[in-house]
UniProtKB/Swiss-Prot annotation:
Role summary: The beta subunit is responsible for the synthesis of L-tryptophan from indole and L-serine.
N6-(pyridoxal phosphate)lysine found at: 112
Annotated metabolic or biological route of this protein: Amino-acid biosynthesis; L-tryptophan biosynthesis; L-tryptophan from chorismate: step 5/5
Protein name: Tryptophan synthase beta chain
Cellular component aspect of the GO annotation: cytoplasm
Organism: Thermosipho africanus (strain TCF52B)
Amino acid sequence: MREFVNLKFEEMPKVWYNVLSDLPFKLDPPLDPETNKPMSPEKLLKIFPAPLLEQEVNDTDKFIDIPEEILKEYAVYRPTPLIRANFLEEYLQTPAKIYYKYEGQSPTGSHKTNTALAQAYYNKISGVKKLYTETGAGQWGSALSYSGLKFGINVNIYMVRVSFNQKPARKSIMKLFNGKVTPSPSRNTKSGRKYEENHPGSLGIAISEAMEEVLQRNDSKYALGSVLNHVLLHQTIIGLEIKKQLEKLNIQPDVIIGCHGGGSNFGGTILPFIPDKLSGKNIRFIACEPESCPTLTKGEYRYDFGDTAGFTPLLKMYTLGKDFIPPSIHAGGLRYHGAAPIISALLNHNLIEAKAFSQEETFKAARLFSKLEGIIPAPESSHAIAGAIKEALNAKKENKEKIIVFTLSGHGLFDLNAYI
């Protein structure tokens, strides 16, 4: 019998969790590349609205109330279910119990809507009329287009060219929700014109193009789908729900897993459990990334730009270097040279682990999961499945009844050409 754990809307957390309030160390601040000193709030206000900047630097409040307007939009698809992967367990013949948090039932099919709605709302109340952003595989661009439509904001998206060509359905969704989509690198910006027109692009280049647009205008702000503290904050709705769902089952997780590109999905999943780890509970957190873009497993922990052209502040993070151009893999949402400062600091302090998987291994896991569990996962999410399978097989070798939880961050119904 398939085991679902559903929460009623009344049981859904009405707050986001701020891990910065609990960490036993301080994050290194973003630096102004012109001075190598901490970035002034005045400069950041050119890029982000004040309410999001306040969330970005808040390291005192443990919980941040979710505004009623956002809760009303969350009610369309949240809470999301926690599902036991019974068929996968049986196939693997493992004593482990595997649970997955399914974020694919959001309006645009991934976890990205959790922060897109929040960012659109805070920009709206700040009087912003136009947002510029980047997107890799299109999940973030889709989510922000949807959220912009909900809150009356025009959304302009620079989509990494390789994904722009690979994923036409994602372009259609963005256009359906009135988003304006441009392949990156483009001829629109100085940042884009540095590259040949058929260049595959990268998230770093697309961020540069969006940032360049904002810095040249007075009517626009920038929205980022991952990496920054406030983005991970909004995504903690995932982990907070998981905690409540596991409490209903009266079980404690041994391992929590998520795919990792910039860190929003992984952070949103594991951050609410960090206090448990800090209090001495034996719980592991595993970030699963692609071998072709091994930011956490092979990157350097240092200050670097978040984009290719150098428009962003310098962030202390694991990085492959701002000029790194990843191979044109199908998991376009994971093709990022850097990582969230929060996730990077947790890894540097040995509070989390990171593992890299090949595209072949992740798609093997994705196909198996599709056939057994009946959900076709996004290529990005497939890295978490591969990680969960690996942990379940280790439990089988050790003959241990581990509780494994992972987030299935989105469905792959718009990525079917990757499965052919």
